[in-house]
Every structure is written in C-alpha cells, then in structure tokens.
C-alpha cells in the first residue's frame, strides 16, 4: 500500500454487525456456509456503498489515468479495445470470494482506493487485470492466458507485485532483500544506508553479520578494541525503526550469524525476555547458520569451538562465511594462530530451544545441507526474513567515502505461488500454467528498480533468480480424503513437486532461447548436468507414485508425471541452450495471499478447521479451511499443534528434494513441549534434509472455543507474501 493510501474506516457499529455476525455464526453453529452470507453482506453493506461509480470502462480508465492512480505506460502497451476486452473477460469468470476473510483481505489490503481513503476504485477483477497487463508486457494473447491462471486462483503473484502492478504511486514489485556486511567500517556504513533506502521503499532486509570481528578482537592490531556485533545490531534495529513507511508499519529486518562466531551466545541473549535494555533486540529477527559439525559435536556431547573471524581472514584471506567450518573444523582447531573459545554444543542447542519458547527466534539455516544442494560455485551464507531464499552472494569493496571500489553480488527475491488444488485441477494445462508463472516472475526481475542497492541490482541483473512457491497443500489433501500425516500425503507432495520442478526448469530453458543464459551458467552443476543426476541416474521407476490413491489422483486430474526420458531430453536441452534464471523455486509462508485466495498456507497444516484471526477494529474473524464442509472436516480436524512436528517435517522434506532453494518450515509446539522436544525437532529436520527452520510457534492452553493463543511473533508482511 502506498504511503498516501489509508484503509477506509467504518462509520457506525451497524456497518460492522451483520457480516461480522454471519462470520461468527460459521464458528458457533459449525455451519460453514453461513460464512458466504458474511461475504455477501460485506459486499452489499460495506463495499458497494464505498465504491466509486463509473458509467463506462472508458470513463473509469480516463479518471484513473488523469488522476495519477494508474500508470499510463502500462495501459498504453495495449489498445483501448484490448483493455476493454481483457476487463470484460475478467468479469466473465464470475469470480466469487470463497470466504469472508478473502473479501476482507482484498479490500483492506490490496484494492486501489482514492487518496482520501473514502472510496474503492477496484474490485478483485480490476486488480487482476492490472497485473496481467504488466506481466504480459504488451502481449495481448499472453495477457488473456495469464488472466485465466490468476483469476482462477491457479497462480498468485506475491503481495508486492499483486498490490503495486499498474499503479502510478506505488511501492516496488520486489520487497525482500539480502545484504552481506564485511568486516570494515565502510561496509557497515553502506549496509545501514542501503537498509534505510530499501526499508523506505517497503523492503524487508536480511543482513549477514558472520564476518564481523568479535568483541575483544584487535582494531589496527591493538588488542581488545572491537565491540563485536551487538552495537551493529542496535544500529540496524534503530534504522528499521526510523524507516517506518511514514508511520504505517515498522521496517522489517533480520540478521544472520554463523553459530561458530565467538559472539553467538551474546547474539542469542539479545532476545531473552529479561535481557538488559543495553543489549536487548526487540524487533530485529535473528537467524543462525548451523553446519553439520555442530550437530556432530552435540551428538558426541563435546565442546564446540568458536573461531575468530578476524583471525580466519588474516590467516586464510577468506571470510568466516566463505569457508566450510565442517570441512575445516579440526584444521582451525589445531591452528594456534586462530583464537578460539569453547562452549558446550548441547548447551548451545538448549539455549536455542529456550529462546524459541520465549520468542519464536532464531531462524535456523542448515549450512552444509543448502550448500550440498547448491548448483553454483560460490557459497550460500545466509537466508532471508522467511528462510526460503538461499542463493550465493559475493562481497563488495568500498572507498572511504562509501562509493564502490568493487560491486559485489547481493540478492533480491521475486516470488509467486501456485495454488496446489487449482494447479492440479488445471490438468493438462499444468505445463502452460508453470510456463506463464515463470515468465511472470522473470519479467518482475527484469523491470524491478534496484538502483538504491547497486550490489542487489548487479546480482539480480546477472542471475534473474526466481522463487516459484506453492500453497494450499492441506486444502488439496483434505478435499481429496487424504490425512496430512499419511503416507499418501508424503507421496503426493513428492510427485507434485517433482512434476513442478520439471516444468519450471523447462520454462527457464525456453526463456533462455529468447533472453539468454544467466551469467556464469557454464560454471554450474546445471551446465555439466550433475545437478540432475538425481533424476537421470536412478532407477527409471524411482520418481513414481508409491501409493495407488496418489496415482489415481494424477490420473483423475489428467496431470502427466514426467518420465526419466523426459528429464534426459530436458537436461540435454539445458546443457545446449542454458537457463535464463539461476534459481527457480522457493516456498514462502504465503500468509496474506493464502487468506486472499481462501486457501491453506504454504505446505503447512491448518491450525484448526476454523482459524481465529484478530483484525484491528473488527476483532475476531473466523476463517474456515479451504472448502470446509461436514464431509471433509475429519481431514482438517487435527491441526498443526495436534499433528506435531514429524508429519510437517516429512512433508517439507519430500518437497525439498525438488526445490532448488528452501522452504519456510514452521514448527508448532504445545506448552507441554520441553527444550528436549524442540531439540528432537531440530535433529529430525536436519536428518530429513530440510534446508531451514522458520518460526517456532508455541500454543498456550486456553479454554475451549476461546482464541488460539500462541507466542505473538510479528509476521513478516514482506515475505509472507
């Protein structure tokens, strides 16, 4: 939402009563169809009276262009007759909101409003039209094809794109960024400046702290001079607080630290409930990078060494983040020129668990897991605010005036999600759906304005990395009589993402013919084909359905599962013509767009069949699960807290085999769980090959039918897309 827009307010309590009453009855009486009455009441009582009326498409379009609501450049890529036809086609699909929350979310957060906030200027169809006009880039026939995919909820662009497409006064189409900080004042200063600029533009920024020298390290060879990373964290937190989008919301930021950094325990202590105000970090999110060796040390009940990043750089000429601590651990341990301190590995993991119960932080990135899966020559050193983006980066170098001596390569996230249920229902059109989705995300990467962050601009222009994700897994499973914690659920997840990966790589391969290969393609495991060995050098029936029920589903929806021969042909084409994009898939939490699409979030199970949300002045909103009715209720009945961590990790691990980046994995624990239970969850996720752990949510025991109480964590509005 742009800084000039305000959310419309309700004039009277009567405005609220009827549709809120209908919505509440969906929970009270277990009559989920009543929620559709809430939708109708909301549209009639709230939306229509506050929607500006136009007598023709031309009158509306002229008004929106003349008054700087719509970007004339987007409109002018098409004739008026084409615009009118696309708009007419959009309304011909007769889109209807599946629940009250979907309608409320659209008009509250996405619909274009007059600058004074009094009137709506768009319905859902109009917002979709502006997206397809931009994403089709002047191609009328493509716009019609893409219109079908979006308005049928098969593909949903991420919030920054869906919200801002076609607007004259807008934010960026991409709102998630990753920045390295190196161990010098110029890099620190430039990072803070860039953070302010990106946050000013509604961006969420993750920053790497692993390479900063520890507290007590030398400065200009004088010992015990460095203050360590905590003061930098304070500066960053203040920067995000200051850059608060004109008071609309505080900037979103995260910092990642390698767990073998000497300041790691102080880093974690900043999130303690009883932390001293001098070190306490309230709003900045924390993430840890944990290599395999740390788990091995904990398993053996050994002490873990923390290595001076300053000494590592002096000795090896490499930053801490750019070496494999697992591979070099014992060499570093024996090197007398590397200062080291020791802590108990098990105590370290216990501290993480304690903090997860207190705050939900830190995020965890499994260092060696993501780098083993990495197809590129440079190391992955961090993730983003939702722990689904894992891409290599390169450091920048600066002059003393903070101008660039050498522009490195940093990261931005271009995201969008498939609705799994609707994608399966697309049947034989699945390949076209994924082709259009990849092309749309690719276009966003090519039109995004990133001048304020030259290293991010360079990384984006060289790589055009994408993050095609997915949502509504639980919704699809439940409506097809499959329990979330069943072998059929894992089987379906495996084969679905196997199929999506094939079509995503195929789409990028076709784009490469038109747009060229991404930079350094020749130096990747894609170019030599080894990345695809998991598909081409296994038994021909390895990637096939293992349960009759799942095979029957693919047959029912007429979704063709790629064969090994299909993969071999695709790999040959990739080796010949390349890929347009360095990365293709990443599964974000999909908070906002799941509500907008009235479906279940990401790959997670629902929290309960009817979720309770608090939405400002409206109070509680009851959100029935996807197509919830009395027939499928039993498949939604056990929510995330009842299921426990194992089924969720099993699902994520099945998908992760085919996702070249990461998957936002949230763990749900009851208040009966112990730190030992959480440690078991970390180990299980690590052993199953998950790339990361996002939040840990802990539910407190409450009275039946009262609101679900969890540790209140500020969801990332940027990355939950």
Swiss-Prot record:
Q: Which reaction does it catalyse?
A: a 2'-deoxyribonucleoside 5'-diphosphate + [thioredoxin]-disulfide + H2O = a ribonucleoside 5'-diphosphate + [thioredoxin]-dithiol
Point out the annotated site residues (description: Important for electron transfer). 694-695
What residues correspond to the site Allosteric effector binding? 183, 213
Q: Where is this site: Interacts with thioredoxin/glutaredoxin?
A: 716, 719
CDD domains listed in its UniProt record? RNR_I
Q: Does the keyword Oxidoreductase apply?
A: yes
InterPro entries this protein is in? NrdE_NrdA_C, RNR_1b_NrdE, RNR_lg_C, RNR_lsu_N, RNR_N, RNR_R1-su_N, Rrm1
Q: Where is this site: Important for hydrogen atom transfer?
A: 176, 413
- Is the keyword ATP-binding in the record? yes
* Active-site residues, record numbering mapped to chain: 384 (proton acceptor), 386 (cysteine radical intermediate), 388 (proton acceptor)
Q: Which family does it belong to?
A: Belongs to the ribonucleoside diphosphate reductase large chain family.
Provide the assembly information.
Answer: Tetramer of two alpha and two beta subunits.
Role noted for this protein: Provides the precursors necessary for DNA synthesis. Catalyzes the biosynthesis of deoxyribonucleotides from the corresponding ribonucleotides.
Write down what this protein is called: Ribonucleoside-diphosphate reductase subunit alpha
Q: Which organism is it from?
A: Mycoplasma genitalium (strain ATCC 33530 / DSM 19775 / NCTC 10195 / G37)
């Amino acid at each position: 939402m742009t800084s000039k827009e305000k959310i419309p307010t309700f004039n009277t309590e009567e405005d609220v009563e009827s549709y809120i009453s209908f919505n509440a009855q969906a929970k009270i009486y277990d009559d989920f169809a009543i929620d559709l009455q809430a939708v109708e009441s909301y549209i009639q009582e709230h939306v229509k009276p506050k929607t500006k009326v136009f007598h023709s498409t031309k009158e509306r379009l002229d008004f929106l262009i003349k008054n700087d609501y719509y970007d004339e450049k987007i409109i002018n890529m098409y004739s008026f007759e084409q615009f009118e036809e696309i708009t007419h086609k959009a309304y011909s699909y007769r889109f209807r909101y599946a629940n009250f929350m979907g309608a409320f979310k659209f008009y509250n957060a996405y619909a274009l409003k007059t600058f004074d906030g009094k009137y709506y200027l768009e319905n859902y169809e109009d917002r979709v039209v502006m997206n397809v006009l931009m994403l089709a880039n002047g191609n009328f026939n493509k716009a019609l094809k893409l219109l079908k995919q979006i308005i049928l909820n098969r593909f949903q662009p991420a919030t920054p794109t869906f919200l801002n497409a076609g607007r004259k006064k807008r934010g960026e189409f991409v709102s998630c960024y990753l920045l390295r900080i190196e161990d010098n004042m110029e890099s620190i200063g430039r990072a803070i400046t860039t953070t302010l600029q990106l946050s000013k533009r509604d961006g969420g920024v993750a920053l790497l702290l692993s390479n900063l020298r520890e507290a007590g390290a030398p400065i200009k060879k004088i010992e015990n001079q460095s203050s360590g990373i905590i003061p930098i964290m304070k500066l960053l937190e203040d920067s995000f607080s200051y850059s608060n989008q004109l008071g609309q919301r505080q900037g979103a930021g995260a910092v990642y630290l390698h767990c073998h950094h000497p300041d790691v325990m102080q880093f974690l202590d900043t999130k303690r409930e009883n932390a001293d105000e001098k070190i306490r970090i309230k709003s900045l999110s924390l993430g840890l990078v944990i290599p395999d060796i740390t788990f091995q040390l904990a398993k053996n009940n050994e002490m873990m060494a923390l290595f001076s990043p300053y000494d590592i750089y002096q000795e090896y000429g490499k930053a801490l983040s750019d070496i494999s601590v697992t591979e070099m651990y014992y060499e570093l341990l024996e090197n007398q020129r590397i200062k080291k301190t020791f802590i108990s590995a098990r105590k370290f993991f216990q501290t993480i668990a304690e903090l997860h119960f207190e705050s939900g932080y830190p995020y965890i990135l499994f260092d060696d897991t993501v780098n083993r899966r990495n197809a590129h020559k440079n190391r992955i050193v961090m993730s983003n605010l939702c722990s689904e983006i894992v891409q290599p980066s390169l450091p920048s170098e600066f002059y003393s005036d903070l101008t660039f001596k050498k522009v490195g390569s940093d990261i931005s996230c271009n995201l969008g999600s498939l609705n799994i249920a609707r994608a399966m229902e697309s049947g034989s059109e699945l390949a076209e759906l994924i082709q259009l989705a990849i092309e749309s995300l690719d276009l966003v990467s090519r039109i995004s304005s990133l001048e304020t962050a030259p290293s991010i601009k360079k990384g984006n222009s060289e790589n055009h990395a994408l993050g095609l994700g997915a949502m509504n897994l639980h919704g699809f499973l439940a409506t097809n009589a499959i329990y979330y914690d069943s072998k059929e659920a894992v089987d379906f997840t495996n084969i679905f993402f196997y199929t999506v990966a094939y079509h995503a790589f195929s789409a990028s391969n076709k784009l490469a013919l038109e747009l060229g290969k991404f930079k350094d393609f020749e130096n990747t495991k894609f170019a030599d084909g080894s990345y695809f060995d998991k598909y081409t050098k296994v038994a021909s029936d390895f990637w096939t359905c293992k349960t009759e029920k799942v095979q029957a589903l693919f047959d029912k929806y007429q979704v063709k599962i790629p064969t090994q021969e299909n993969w071999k042909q695709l790999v040959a084409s990739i080796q010949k013509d390349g890929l347009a994009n360095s990365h293709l898939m990443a599964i974000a939490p999909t908070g906002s767009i799941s509500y907008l699409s009235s479906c279940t979030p990401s790959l997670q199970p629902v929290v309960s069949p009817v979720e309770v949300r608090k939405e400002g002045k409206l109070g509680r909103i009851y959100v029935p699960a996807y197509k919830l009715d009395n027939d499928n209720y039993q498949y939604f009945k056990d929510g995330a807290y009842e299921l426990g961590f194992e089924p969720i990790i099993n699902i994520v691990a099945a998908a992760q085999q085919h996702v070249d980046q990461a998957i936002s994995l949230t763990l749900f624990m009851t208040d009966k769980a112990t730190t030992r239970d959480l440690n078991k969850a970390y180990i299980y996720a690590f052993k199953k090959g998950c790339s990361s752990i996002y939040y840990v949510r802990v539910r407190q025991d409450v009275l039946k039918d009262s609101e679900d109480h969890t540790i209140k964590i500020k969801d990332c509005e940027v990355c939950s897309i």
